C-alpha cells in the first residue's frame, strides 16, 4: 500500500532551508508514529510531499487513521501507483478503478501532472472524463459540486490512481517549534489549548496541580495520555504532578476571601515557571479565556503574569465556551472533561474581578513561600509513556483476568463511537456497555452482586478506571485482558 502525504500549505511558503527542515522533521515524526504498526514501513521525502509505503495490508486502516492525526499534514492520498503508455491507457486504468464508484453518480475528473508529456492536464481531464461518460451509462459529468471527483496524478511515466483522500489536522510538525508546558486540569479549556499548541509544532509537556486527591490525578492522567497518544506520540514528553493541597490550605488560612482566586493562580504560575526553568521549557500554556471566570479579566490576568518572566500563552483567550466545547468534541476530550471535577472555582465565595496589585502583594506577604518551594521540589515527574506502566503497578491489587466465571460480566468502557465501530462480542458471557465517562455516576446502579470485568482496547483506560472504582469502595471489579 502507498500513501502520499501533502504538506500543510504554510510549510510550502517557507524558505528552502526551513522547508527542508520541516519536511525532514515531519518525515521523522511519521516514522516514529507508524513504526508500531509496520516495522518494514518506508518513509520517503520529496520536495512537495512525503511518500509512505507499507507491506502489511492488515494495518491499512490503522496507518491511515494515524496519519490523519499527525500535525503538519494537510491531507493524505491513498494511491495505487501504476505505469502507463499514453492517454488512452490512463483512461482504461481509471475506468477499471472507478467504474463501480461512478454508477448512478455525477462526476468530474481532476488531474495534476509533473514531468514532460505530449499532453496537458486539461487534455487528460477531457479525454478521461469523456471516456468515463461514454462507458458508464448511468454516470453524468458535472463540473461543479459533483458526487464524485476522480483524482489522478501523472508523474513522468507513472500514474497515481487516487483511491481516497483523507484530511489531516494541518499545522506544523511537532519539534519545529520550542517546548511548552501546559497547565492541565482535565477540563475543556486546558485540553483544547494543549492540542492547539501541539498542532502548531510544539512539544507539549504537562503540569498538573492536584487539588482533589488521587481520583482527580487519575482523571487528568487519562486526558494527558489521550492527547499525547492521539496527537503527539512522535515525541517523549513529561507529566509533572504537584500536590497543591498544602498551598490551597495556606491560602485559605492566610489570604482574604476576595483575593484567593488571583493569589492561587499566581502561585500556580510561580510553581509552573520553576518547573519550566528546571527542564528548559520556553513558555507556559493555559486554557484561560477572557472574562470566562473572575480571575480571567484583563486586570487579573496582568497581575497573574507579573509573578513570572516566563512567557504565558493563552490560545483560547478570545474563544467562547461553546466554541471550546465544540473543539473538545472534535479532538475527543469532551467526555473526559464533562466528568472532571472542578476545584479552583470553589476556593473563593466573592472573588474580585479587578484585583489591586498592592493589595494582592500585601496578602501574599502572609503566605509561607517555603510551602510552595517544597511542593515543587517534591513534584512527581514521569515520562508520559510510563503512565500505562505505572497504572499497571498501582492497580496490582485489582486482579487482571483472561477468563471468566459464572458470576462475571464484561463491562465495555469504550466510548459509544468506538463500540459502534467495533462491537465487543464474547461467547459464553454477557457484555454490558457503560462508557468510561459514565462510570463515576452510573457504576453504582449496576448489579453489585456481579463481578464486573472492565475492558477496553489497549487496557490503559480499564486499569485507570479500575483503580478509581476501587478508591470509591467498589471491590467487585477486575481488569479483563483476554
Curated annotation (Swiss-Prot):
GO terms for molecular function: ATP binding; CCA tRNA nucleotidyltransferase activity; tRNA binding; tRNA-uracil-4 sulfurtransferase activity. GO terms for biological process: thiamine biosynthetic process; thiamine diphosphate biosynthetic process; thiazole biosynthetic process; tRNA 4-thiouridine biosynthesis. InterPro entries: Rhodanese-like_dom, Rhodanese-like_dom_sf, Rossmann-like_a/b/a_fold, ThiI_AANH, ThiI_fer, ThiI_N, THII_Thiazole_biosynth_dom, THUMP_dom. It comes from the Bacteria. Pathway: Cofactor biosynthesis; thiamine diphosphate biosynthesis. The keyword tRNA-binding applies. The active site is at 456 (cysteine persulfide intermediate). It catalyses: [ThiI sulfur-carrier protein]-S-sulfanyl-L-cysteine + a uridine in tRNA + 2 reduced [2Fe-2S]-[ferredoxin] + ATP + H(+) = [ThiI sulfur-carrier protein]-L-cysteine + a 4-thiouridine in tRNA + 2 oxidized [2Fe-2S]-[ferredoxin] + AMP + diphosphate; [ThiS sulfur-carrier protein]-C-terminal Gly-Gly-AMP + S-sulfanyl-L-cysteinyl-[cysteine desulfurase] + AH2 = [ThiS sulfur-carrier protein]-C-terminal-Gly-aminoethanethioate + L-cysteinyl-[cysteine desulfurase] + A + AMP + 2 H(+). Coiled coil: none annotated. Pfam families: ThiI, ThiI_fer, THUMP. One of its GO terms (cellular component) is cytosol. It is found in: Cytoplasm. This is tRNA sulfurtransferase.
